[in-house]
Amino acid sequence: MDTNSNSPNETGILFVGHGSRLPYNKEVVQAIADKYSETKPDYNIEVGFMELAEPNIPTAFNKLAATGVKRIIVTPVFLAHGLHTKRDIPTILGLEPSPDVEQYVQGHGHHHHGHHHGHHHGHHHHHDEETEKIEFDGEIIYTEPIGADDAIVKIIAERVNPHL
């Protein structure tokens, strides 16, 4: 039996998108996950959304957990860090939110009932569907967002340069 947590049956991957009332965000995040899945066809890969689209993060996460994986890699499909990637997503996952965001949220009006103690009570744009809790005893690896990567610069150049 393979006990390597890098093996496909031990590791799940969750792509997290923002979500939108319009279909485009969901379609793009799903397409990115599908394209990635073509490179890792043996891995269980799911997509979940912060808000305004289904499945939400707990539903997608718990679907992966139900496959018996020992660890789940959560990757936010966001260009840059923000309150969602630094506070909201970690809180939903039961991880500690990044302490550096609190200075920016004073008076923001989107606090989680004024306290943080390891579980999620809901989010300002979420409705009652966000009551599902994450149930997982394994390892959660939470990656950085996309960032100012050379691959992004190349894509922007492909869009802009023909018009120069």
Annotate each PLM feature.
Residues M1-L164:
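Active-site-proximal alpha-helix that buttresses catalytic centers in soluble enzyme cores
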